[in-house]
A protein has these predicted regions:
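Positively charged, small/polar-rich N-terminal and surface patches that mediate targeting and assembly
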Residues: 1-112
Length: 112
């Protein structure tokens, strides 16, 4: 099993979520995040004063999938999240040794 983690632009979340649901992905975890990569934040003007925003708002999306679905799900996320601009985000996978559905006690792929 794999945990797929994606850091995305917030306005792309609905598009990514819809694309994943169209591929049969039935569960995901979404949380707010902030950070920076190559774009290094940005400068804004508020009431005539210029200030630098070091941490850019992002969304962290996590999806747990069977190994055989990992590459396909990553491709779906990348395609739906891409704008072609700096700051589109990152997607990575992490091996998962065990998953347990708390309600039923199911383990492994049956618990996804």
């Amino acid at each position: 099993m794999k945990l797929i983690t994606a850091i995305l632009k917030p306005f792309k979340l609905d598009e990514v979520k819809d694309a994943l649901q169209a591929e049969g992905i039935t569960g995901m975890t979404v949380s707010e995040a902030s950070g920076f990569g190559r774009q290094r934040g940005h400068t804004e003007v508020y009431r005539g004063a210029e200030y630098t925003v070091d941490l850019v708002p992002k969304v962290r999306l996590e999806v747990l999938v069977d190994d055989k679905d990992s590459d396909r799900v990553v491709d779906v996320i990348v395609k739906a999240a891409s704008t072609g601009s700096i700051g589109d985000g990152k997607v990575w996978t992490t091996p998962v040794d065990q998953v347990v559905r708390v309600r039923t006690g199911e383990r492994g792929p049956d618990a996804i």
